[in-house]
Amino acid sequence: MISVCPQNDLQKCYRSLTFDVPGQQFEERNEQNLKKRAKKKGSFQPSVAFDTVPSTAGYSSIDDSREGFKGVPVPNYYTMEECYDDETDSFSPNLQYYLRDTFQSSPFLNTRKENKSESSSFPMRSSKLLEKNSDIKKYFLVSKNGKIVRRDYPSTPVIVNETLMINRFEKNWIKLWRQRKLQINERLNDKKKWFTYPELIFSEERIKPLYRGDDSAPCTKEQKRKHKILQQKVGYPNNPKTIVCHINGKKHTWVALDWTVYKFARNLDHIVVITTLPKMISNRKKTAKDDTEWAPGYQKEVIDQKLNDIFDYILQLVKVVKISVKITLEIIVGKIKKSLVDVINVHTPDFLVLATLKHERNENLITYKSKKLTDVFPVSYPIPTFVVPSKRMYSFELNLQREVNEHYVSKNHMKHEHTDVESMSSSMFKKNTISDISSHISVDSYAEDFKRQGYIKKQFNTSNDSIPRKLTGLAQHSRRKITGDIEKLQDDEKDRECTKEKLLLKKIDIIIRESLKSSLAIETLPGKNVSQSSHGDQISSFKNALIGNGSKNTKFRKSLIPYSSSEEQNTTTTIKLSSSPTSQIKFATSVKHKDGRAALGKARNLPDIRHSISFDKENSFDPSDKSSSVDNSIPLRKVKSAGALRKVKTNDSSSSAGSKKSSSSFSTVNTFTGGGVGIFKVFKSGSSSGNKSSSRRNSSSGDVFESDDRNDKKKKKKKKKKSLFLFGKI
């Protein structure tokens, strides 16, 4: 399969491709022979370049080539108003000519032509008129037959570069393109017949008329007409599909040209192939021998020869594909990016085809924020770009070589029936070997990856029982089985009566069943004679090869983790819990860790977190909760203020059922524990000695609080009334 390929290198097979084209006799490289060779191109004929015909004219010069250009009528005489008129918006025939690019004769000019006396006495010309006449001499040329021809296209060169080019088209291309244009025009005339929603596709836009200019002055007819022309949308020109392909001296770029001509191009397409040459600077002065130089350092004859060689190569491919296309070849002196930008501005292509050497399975063909040619154009330019990976196209290149050789072998066999038997046998042997290669190798093959990782050696002496071979064999067997079962399902008469949904379900069952069988076969892959250790090593190396971690110089390993066989053995991993993070809040040394939130001081506006957490406990109506709500074994902290003695509450004390303070304006209401707090204390009896003793059991300052309450009963009553008005702050 792979040993047939020269040097066992599929990735670089594009370098050694050869087309067995019948040889041509040697000719001297002069201009006459090059012209004769251009005429002998067979079905291709020369055509005009882009700088002689506007690209939006639809190749009208080809259509009207027999009729010829009729010339532009220019008036022989000027009126007095035209000579001394300084207003740019005045209505005159010459002004109409410059605005519309056409000349409209007026009736009073005919009277001027008849009167010879007035024509002889021409008035004095101003400086502006002299400049106008000098410009007219640049734009018009009087031919030999007396016709006045314009030579001001392009009026100002948009693109200035040193380029040699060839434009040729197939002999049937013009005929087919005319038919295509007629078909398009017919469909545009009868839109309702060919389009479902013509109102949406060809919507007519209304142009707002211009009545006044920027200076609020009324606009003239010429200004209104200009505004209407500029605001009207013309749309895209009716041109064929244009494909631009870039090649250079590197062989991998020619794979893009092969793919463009052989796979991508269709009838009536315009293929533009460009290549660039570096600009050379010569310090020496020009001599008589340098007259034939096209650019500094390049002879025109050599460039013409190279253009013809490239065209010959494309011609061999077109003959095999048998398509009618137009081909443009350009050799530009300058930088690649600037040359491509110029070509895009000139030809306005629909597609751009480039080649790259990137071929890894886990590698992106396009990289953002890169300065390479294949990365800049797909990202920065609004043109659909095809990037052809040359090293992955070995199957395509081998098939192309086989078909081109078969085409010319069959031609030679028809012309020369009495050829040698040995030459025919050798050609047939080459054909068979190449067909064997192309039939076994697919685009999704991993043969090049195995070779790069060392699985396929140059001698190709690996055993047939290797894991890569078994995997590929299992995959091919499962695919054949699935396709065969689906074909049988479609041919079965009983299944024809089933609905589409049932047929789809049966197909899904076939795919699932065969995929499960293949997965089970992969699990039992090594067999009886292979040891488990060697099998594990082979599997691990194979997995590393698939994800690109086998070689030393591999890149793009951002999201891929290398595989090792030891990972399967240690499936259970122990997770060490880290120590709890230390609190960043520091308290005094006398503060205990069980004091809760009260250790932070007064917190009137803060919500009570403990009530929200222990809601289920407080919701239970267990009588034991009322008596023993506080742990008596843990003594409470004694707090004494420096100024006036006042009560400081903790979380444990505030949540107890026995603590019922009448002067608490910030405590919450708990209806489930049975004790009234806050506002509801007003409606209860003021004497509750048992509760007082239970709440102050462990406090040494209880007597002080009792004496304070007896002496200030009036103040207490006032505070109770305030709690009613402070209900919104609770």
Curated annotation (Swiss-Prot):
Superkingdom to which the source organism belongs? Eukaryota
Ranges of Low complexity composition bias in the record? 653-667, 684-701
Q: What are the record keywords, sorted?
A: Cell cycle
Q: What is the lineage of its organism?
A: Eukaryota, Fungi, Dikarya, Ascomycota, Saccharomycotina
Region annotation Disordered: where it falls in the sequence: 615-667, 684-730
Q: Where is the composition biased (Basic residues)?
A: 713-723
* One annotated GO biological process: autophagy of mitochondrion
User: Can you name this protein?
Assistant: Uncharacterized protein YOR019W
- Where is this chain compositionally biased, Basic and acidic residues type? 615-625
